[in-house]
């Protein structure tokens, strides 16, 4: 049984004077309204949050209908795991209409994480590896050296993100910067400067799903979820909050998840019209582009400098500004990616609309400790 998306809702990302739960509620109600439904029509729900509260407790405001509501958490992949759980409920026949929701409200500053939560010893944190800016810079420096890539590409990626964010109503960072301004900004962890990173933020996102057959009866603008795949790390990969560093690095979870998603959907990266790629920092987008199959490792410069990733390019990436412009409320971030693709495929993306009526889309989210969720969508 195939599954389709019939409604989406998004609370803007940034900093707000309301709770994370309230943002999740706003997103859920918007998704229901977008689908032309009420909460009583939902017979399964899944959701997650790191710091915003318990997702299943949203029923207190949405309505005490007795609906099965599964709370999930997989770090930055939480939205992906919520969507996977909801879609599997439909595929199995356990549900007719399902809701996936994610939200968060993080404290200012970098994430503070206890290494013991990930089964890691204290020395890993004492070495500074629990500081994500330091970890990603270390991984990126090796990648740039291995493939002979110029660090200037990172400034170009961040400039694209902030340029797209400046025309996105729900984005947090709405001020564009040039690549020169970004490259010359204060260094955080070499080679990454201030504006190359995303920041923990706040927001909510929700998606309503049903079977593709039912969706066609309900609306003429449904988007098919052709594939959703979730993978964890294998031995030998170098991942955030995972201390393994083998001499020969094994392909990571993103490679496995993206390959599985494309195989399940029956199409390849070359057939994708618009994509949302995890950009925790600019280097993440650089690496994930190749891991997802959009180019070979070391060949990213052609895509980036040639404008092929721009909204008017051959394969527009992070059309709403990605994490760099939106920030990352962990529970909502992966669902935001999918919602952006849904709106692009429906022609509802406003000033950032990809031209030419895109028909296929791809999303990829990555998180600790080395997990990835990927989707393929189509109209």
For the regions a language model picked out, list residue spans one by one:
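Conserved active-site and cofactor/substrate-binding residues in soluble primary-metabolism enzymes
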Residues: 18-26, 53, 77-81, 93, ...
């Amino acid at each position: 049984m195939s599954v389709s998306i019939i409604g989406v809702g998004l609370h803007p990302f940034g900093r707000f004077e309301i709770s994370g739960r309230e943002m999740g509620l706003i997103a859920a109600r918007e998704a229901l309204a977008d689908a032309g439904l009420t909460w009583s029509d939902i017979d399964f729900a899944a959701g997650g949050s790191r710091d915003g509260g318990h997702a299943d407790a949203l029923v207190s405001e949405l309505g005490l209908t007795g609906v099965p509501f599964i709370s999930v958490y997989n770090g930055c992949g939480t939205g992906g795991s919520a969507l996977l759980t909801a879609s599997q409920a439909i595929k199995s026949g356990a549900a007719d209409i399902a809701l996936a929701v994610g939200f968060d409200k993080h404290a200012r500053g970098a994430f503070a994480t206890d290494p013991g939560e990930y089964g890691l010893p204290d020395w890993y944190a004492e070495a500074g590896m629990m500081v994500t800016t330091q970890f990603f810079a270390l991984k990126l420096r090796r990648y740039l050296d291995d493939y002979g890539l110029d660090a200037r590409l990172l400034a170009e990626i961040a400039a694209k993100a902030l340029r797209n964010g400046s025309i996105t109503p729900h984005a947090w960072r709405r001020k564009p910067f040039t690549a020169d301004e970004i490259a010359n900004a204060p260094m955080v962890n070499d080679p990454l400067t201030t504006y190359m990173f995303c920041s923990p933020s706040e927001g909510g996102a929700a998606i309503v799903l049903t079977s593709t057959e039912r969706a066609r009866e309900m609306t003429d603008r449904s988007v098919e979820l052709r594939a959703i795949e979730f993978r964890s790390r294998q031995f030998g990969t170098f991942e955030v909050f995972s201390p393994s560093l083998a001499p020969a690095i094994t392909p990571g979870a993103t490679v496995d998840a993206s390959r599985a998603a494309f195989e399940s959907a029956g199409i390849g990266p070359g057939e994708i019209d618009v994509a949302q790629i995890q950009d925790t920092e600019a280097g993440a987008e650089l690496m994930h582009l190749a891991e997802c199959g959009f180019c070979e490792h070391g060949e990213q410069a052609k895509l980036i400098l040639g404008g092929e990733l721009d909204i008017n390019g051959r394969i527009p990436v992070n059309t709403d500004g990605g994490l760099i412009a939106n920030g990352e409320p962990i529970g909502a971030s992966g669902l935001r990616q999918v919602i952006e693709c849904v709106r692009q495929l429906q022609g509802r993306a406003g000033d950032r609309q990809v031209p030419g009526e895109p028909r296929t889309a791809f999303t990829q989210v990555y998180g600790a400790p080395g997990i990835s969720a990927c989707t393929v969508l189509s109209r």
